[in-house]
């Protein structure tokens, strides 16, 4: 099955801490890890692991974080021909604090993800399409309008879309 994912690509910086900070509070973290992330990238990796032929459409910066964000997808066989490099914006980054129970706080600096436009999309998207709302809404709406098959929309982060 062919799946196209139109979505975000981030580098996740995950810090574990004994507790999450209250507003204005600083806590000392225990560990820091760097992982590929972004809802789109995560969806592409999951679909690839399940045996689908996956193409990811997104945008990264012209920086070292892009290489880290894309390396695992490339290794897993995700088609990255739809990923463009933005020379004016950095790769998206998610700063994630996690406590021992798994509760988390996340701040996303979208960076190049906000530069994905309808012009970057193919005129027809064959097979299944997966989208989410970490890209500009007009790009997500254009992708859905060009899809010829099943569409799976993860409406997160929640925000208004047209019908």
Where are these regions (language model features)?
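Short charge-dense sequence patches
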Residues: 15-26, 71, 91-97, 148
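Flexible domain-boundary/linker segments
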Residues: 20-23, 64, 90, 112, ...
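Beta-strand->loop->alpha-helix junctions that form or flank phosphate-binding loops
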Residues: 6, 31-34, 57-62, 80-91, ...
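Short Asp/Glu-rich motifs
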Residues: 66-67, 92-93, 163
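Ribokinase/PfkB-type carbohydrate-kinase core domain
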Residues: 1-9, 71-85, 96-163
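Glycine-rich phosphate/adenosyl-contacting loop at the front of the ribokinase-like
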Residues: 1-59, 64-68
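Short, basic and Ser/Thr-rich N-terminal targeting/leader segments
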Residues: 50, 76, 89-92
